[in-house]
Amino acid sequence: MPAVGDQHKLIANPFEEPQRRISEYTAQEIATLQSRLEKQLGPEYLSSRAGPSGQKVHYISSEKCIQLANEVFGFNGWSSSIQNIQVDFVDEHPQTLKINMGISVIMRVTLRDGTYHEDLGYGHIENCKGKAAAFEKAKKEATTDALKRALRQFGNVLGNCIYDKQYLAKVTKMKVEPTKFAEDNLHRHSDFVKKEPVEADIMKVDSVGAGARPPALGNEESFEDLLGELDEADFNMADEGHPDEVVLPQAVHNSLNDKPVHQQLTNLNPQAQQSRPLSRSGSTGSLNTRQQPQNSHQFTARAQSRPPQQQLNSNQSRPMGQPVNNSSNANTPNNPQNYTTPQKPAPAAPAPQAGAAVAPAPETVGFFSAKAVTQLPEEALASGQVAPKPGLAFNPHAESPSIRKTPGIDHTKSKPLARNGQHVPPAKTTETEAEPSTSLSRPAGAHAASRPVTMNEARSASGSFSRAGPPMGGNAGNMGKPNVVNPQLDHTRRIGAPGMSGFSSSPSTNRGQYRPLTMKRPAPVVGGGAGQTKDGNGDSATTTTIAANTTAGSATGGNAAPSAGNGGRVPLTDMSANASNATAAGAATSGPEVKRQRLA
């Protein structure tokens, strides 16, 4: 049976103080708290406001004080409680009905080990319109002031250092840099958080048996080469036109210990490798692609299975950087346009031994355009086993509509062009030096009676428009020689310039060339003379002969004027004191009338 008074034990007495659990600090924790509390605050924790008589009053704001308490004691290491609230005064103005109020609060701050400090805080308000607003403002101010004063009793770090005048005079002179706002530290609602896409590289791994060994992948350099290809690739290509070709690397299926192709060919033909400079294929540009290692007997079997004509064509189209192991091509004389010396025949590759395992030939790999590569599956690109397909293969002979081309010119071949826009056949390499033209002056003697060579005949004989005479300059004899290095460019160098065989090729030689003057032929003179017609009617005039010129020259003192019919210059009339002599000499000679000078 329950005893008397047991019915009251089921209900807790609200007037009794509950038993508190006290967790004491260890000596190490006390030493740590003591070292923290002894430190002074930095200038970033201090605030200032205008005080009485224009002085600055420094204080610590409530939010910074609570933050410091949480840092030192922990968020669960301290607590605060209001011990007493007392209203000191409440005054209401009789006319304006405004309220003045003052409230004092006693606050206690307790640590988790039971240590506590109490202090008094005060709050007041003047000329408030309502009582509720006056009580709210006064009580909050008193409580905050009491809390800050209670916390400062624990040490300097919680605000006690502000009452040190020397410290305050020095710390206020320190400059505080503005803090940077960190948006990442904000606590955001899940609906307003920006969801950034996570780029996860999903690797497709084929299922491999427990006892099976995974296929050997390429070297680590292959991945670096792939990155290099992506860096140099041009992804900003237009939709129309033909983009640059892309070379797909072959997958490495053999073991990493096999020798690569260029090593085997270097052992087979070391002399050819030394004499030939390294070069790159025009289709690959500067991309370094790794070749698939193969055995030497595979190349030998392939070369024997092809017909001779196909081997010859493949060797001719092979770039300079790749070795040639075909002995028949080494004996063929080189083209004159190639500047390499003939190579010695390379020794033939040894025949495969009987019983040796012959690896199957790799699948054919073709060139694809940039648009076609995007249509290929990723599995085929990763394995490297991509066979050329019709419609996707790269066509090197396709013409781009975006490139302007001159109509009527074959753009597939490199040929010289004339000024009229037509192709010029290449000049013959067996062109001989032209003989110098005959001089116009003949020596006096047995050939004096013969007709001298006119200027027109000298031009036709020499094939040049330059003046007649011996070659000028020491290099005049080399002008007729063809261009041995590039014979097809001989005629392109001479476009627009006259033939210079046997004469100097300087453009200044054409400036002094002779041009006959135009003149009006006078009426024929009736009478016996060298310039008369045979019948005296003037129907047909004969050309002045050499004898007539010689006779006229003898009459005038040996200076005969060349006739206009032979292209000579007609001298002007002498206006000096010897004009009478010149007139007499002109009357004695036969021929057309001389050109007279016009008098003003």
Curated annotation (Swiss-Prot):
It holds the Pfam family Rad52_Rad22. GO terms for cellular component: nucleus. One of its GO terms (molecular function) is DNA binding. InterPro entries: DNA_recomb/repair_Rad52, Rad52_fam, Rad52_Rad59_Rad22, Rad52_Rad59_Rad22_sf. This is DNA repair and recombination protein mus-11. SUPFAM superfamilies: dsRNA-binding domain-like. Residues 148-152 bind DNA. Belongs to the RAD52 family. Part of a complex that includes mei-3/rad51 and mus-11/rad52. Signal peptide: none annotated. One of its GO terms (biological process) is DNA recombinase assembly. Residues 325-343, 458-470, 540-564, 577-591 have a biased composition (Low complexity). Residues 268-357, 387-600 are annotated as: Disordered. NCBIfam families: rad52. Its main location: nucleus. It is found in: Nucleus. Residues 268-319, 502-512 have a biased composition (Polar residues). Involved in DNA double-strand break (DSB) repair and recombination. Promotes the annealing of complementary single-stranded DNA and by stimulation of the mei-3/rad51 recombinase. Keywords: DNA damage, DNA recombination, DNA repair, DNA-binding, Nucleus.
